[in-house]
Amino acid sequence: MSKFNRIHLVVLDSVGIGAAPDADKFFNAGVADTDSDTLGHISEAAGLSVPNMAKIGLGNISRPIPLKTVPTEDNPTGYVTKLEEVSLGKDTMTGHWEIMGLNITEPFDTFWNGFPEEILTKIEEFSGRKIIREANKPYSGTAVIDDFGPRQMETGELIVYTSADPVLQIAAHEDIIPVEELYKICEYARSITLERPALLGRIIARPYVGDPGNFTRTANRHDYAVSPFQDTVLNKLADAGVPTYAVGKINDIFNGSGITNDMGHNKSNSHGIDTLIKTLQLPEFTKGFSFTNLVDFDANFGHRRDPEGYRDCLHEFDNRLPEIIANMKEDDLLLITADHGNDPTYAGTDHTREYIPLLAYSVSFTGNGLIPQGHFADISATVAENFGVDTAMIGESFLSHLK
């Protein structure tokens, strides 16, 4: 019998809690990640007031220096710890796949200086369209169409760009490059990025409409992902008849593998929280696992190195945390964590190699305190033990510590 009938995992994308032991092997603009500390530096630089997460025990997590503006709790309402990444990567897919039990020993490729000519030339030859070379670098999806959309409307050239994650994105105005044509180009790009030197996690079609100065991306986005290289705990759950619900980009990250119910993409963190709450309220969701990603921390503030915006985004989530808890049942477990760091005060614009926080809360808890420090995959091992399924590659359950 399950200890908890429902478990809800919420990933606050990029909310790291201090440099990992191997941070010296990961870099931002030539600077090692050894001094990165997403939550710590936001707390110092911008101030951080998150009373609801603090009440669970966020400020009690072991750190060399306590969070400046997040107090410790003498009697927290939950259990907390920090977790270390084993896998060789600090991207979204690697983090999430490890959280679900995999050890990624060959990281995906990222292209901070843009894609090599070999890739661009192949796409040009297949599509019969030129590629705007100036866009070939990590770029904000809205900024890239603002900057190059007018040129695309005149020339029909493709806008190919990337991000901090191992993705290749192609933006196309729907009136200039029909959506079906864009999809075919992206399918081809997927076929040539399945191995080194360009092993990518996703190819993303990014259609948009409108006029210069007023472009908007449409709902015709399509992701061409790769499935995890072996079963995750999501697959183990689905195979055992335990429903799995994906909120936000979780379905894309796992290419639908092990997902029985996709609740759709998030328009924003707030929209994602709305969707999570609707998921919690589903009459048929009496047992199972929900998995939510809230990406605004990372996409809107981490990469843009905006500590004040990041702080406000954390405040927004914390303010809505009581709503999530109010929709939980007594035999529900809430787990709040992250997938990597993205220190908005750090060098460069890339993710940072950090520990991730873990907050565990249930109405049924009679105890509280610290969970032994472990690794990302301990989350999936805990979920697996709770529902009586096998673990994946790695992970040690902390279920027995939750009382």
Curated annotation (Swiss-Prot):
Binding-site positions, Mn(2+) 2: 298, 303, 351
Cofactor note: Binds 2 manganese ions.
GO cellular component: cytosol
Pathway linked to the protein: Carbohydrate degradation; 2-deoxy-D-ribose 1-phosphate degradation; D-glyceraldehyde 3-phosphate and acetaldehyde from 2-deoxy-alpha-D-ribose 1-phosphate: step 1/2
SUPFAM superfamilies, per database record: Alkaline phosphatase-like, DeoB insert domain-like
Record GO terms (molecular function): magnesium ion binding; manganese ion binding; phosphopentomutase activity
Cofactors required: Mn(2+)
EC number: 5.4.2.7
Gene3D superfamilies: Alkaline Phosphatase, subunit A, Phosphopentomutase
GO biological process, one term: metabolic compound salvage
Keywords: Cytoplasm, Isomerase, Manganese, Metal-binding
Protein name: Phosphopentomutase
